[in-house]
Structure formats: structure tokens, C-alpha cells
From Swiss-Prot:
InterPro entries: Ribosomal_uL5 (IPR002132), Ribosomal_uL5_bac-type (IPR020930), Ribosomal_uL5_C (IPR031309), Ribosomal_uL5_dom_sf (IPR022803), Ribosomal_uL5_N (IPR031310). The gene is rplE. Part of the 50S ribosomal subunit; part of the 5S rRNA/L5/L18/L25 subcomplex. Contacts the 5S rRNA and the P site tRNA. Forms a bridge to the 30S subunit in the 70S ribosome. Belongs to the universal ribosomal protein uL5 family. It comes from Spiroplasma kunkelii. Pfam families: Ribosomal_L5, Ribosomal_L5_C. GO terms for molecular function: rRNA binding; structural constituent of ribosome; tRNA binding. Coiled coil: none annotated. HAMAP family: Ribosomal_uL5_B. GO terms for biological process: translation. This is Large ribosomal subunit protein uL5. It comes from the Bacteria.
């Protein structure tokens, strides 16, 4: 696994983006600020053990202890009360962020069944990219035999880019496999 994604960014990607995107200063070149990995569990209202499973899996995948997310409002039709645990999330920054991004690009995404590339239109208009993964078993840390239920997750990559074009160029240079 290439752990030097951060070095690659600092040594080559910054210079290439500076020339291509016509920035006035090298400090305007976008950088990945943080990555937020979120797993929701709708069945956590009936079974409290589900949250424990999710937090363990997220901890294995990211290397950090997740924060349990709780419901903001009560919804009677979902048998949900305010304050009930309904998921978990991890915010990655620094070295762990670059390691996770490298693992996502080079190991996890190629293991997705029928993978034809990421949607290049999933940017939010402010330079952030969100992708959904249907199975947590694409990550090498997860043992398929120990998984009780296959769950998906949301991964949000927050960049300092002010528009989608700059963020797309940054992520493409980092190796994100976007659809053509």
C-alpha cells in the first residue's frame, strides 16, 4: 500500500494543479481537509447490539474510535425516540486521513462488484465529494465470516476548494477513479 499519498500531494500534485488551474498563489491550490465516514443503522432501534457492531467495524476500517450518532427528533412511524443511537461516524484528519484515502482508492474501490468508476457529479457545489458504499466488506480489515449483516456507509471528502472543478481536479490527481 502506498502510504506516501501525502508526499505525492506535496511534491507533485500541488505543482501540477498550480500550473493547470491558473492559481495566483500556491496557497490557493486545494487540499483535502478531512474525511467523514458515517454508518447508519435503522434496525438499531430494535436491537442495541447493532450499534456495538457498527462501532467495532468502523474502528477496524478507520483506525479511530467512532462517535455514536443519536436521533435529533422522535418519529413514531419508525419507533424512534429523540436521543436514541442510530449510527456512528468517524472524522479523519492528517496522516490517518491520507492513509484511509489511499486504502479507499487503491484497495477498497477496486473490490466493489461491477465497479465502473465513481459518479463525477456527486460534488455539493462547494468542493466537497460524497460517495456511498453499499458493502463494508470491501475493506480488507473486515472479516467476511464475522459480519452479521452487510451494511453500507457514506464517505464525505471535504476539500478547501471553492468550486467543484478544482475539487474534481484534485481528487483525480490523487487517483480517484471517476467515470469518463
Amino acid at each position: 500500500m502506498n502510504v506516501n499519498l501525502e508526499k505525492k500531494y506535496k511534491n507533485t500534485i500541488v505543482k501540477e494543479l498550480f500550473k493547470e488551474q491558473r492559481f495566483q498563489s500556491i496557497m490557493q491550490v486545494p487540499v483535502v481537509k478531512k474525511i467523514v465516514v458515517n454508518m447508519g443503522a435503522g434496525d438499531a432501534t430494535q436491537n442495541s447490539k447493532v450499534i456495538e457492531d457498527i462501532t467495532n467495524e468502523l474502528a477496524l476500517i478507520t483506525g479511530l474510535r467512532p462517535v455514536v450518532t443519536k436521533a435529533k427528533d422522535s418519529i413514531a412511524s419508525f419507533k424512534l425516540r429523540e436521543g436514541m443511537p442510530i449510527g456512528a461516524k468517524v472524522t479523519l484528519r492528517g496522516k490517518k486521513m491520507y492513509q484511509f484515502l489511499d486504502k479507499l482508492i487503491n484497495i477498497a474501490l477496486p473490490r466493489v462488484r461491477d465497479f465502473r468508476g465513481l459518479n463525477k457529479d456527486a460534488f455539493d457545489g462547494r468542493g466537497n465529494y460524497t460517495l456511498g458504499i453499499k458493502e463494508q466488506i470491501i475493506f480488507p480489515e473486515i472479516d467476511y465470516d464475522k459480519v452479521k449483516r452487510v451494511r453500507g456507509m457514506d464517505i464525505t471528502i471535504v476539500t478547501s476548494a471553492t468550486n467543484d472543478a478544482d475539487a474534481r481536479a484534485l481528487l483525480r490527481k490523487m487517483g480517484m477513479p471517476f467515470k469518463k
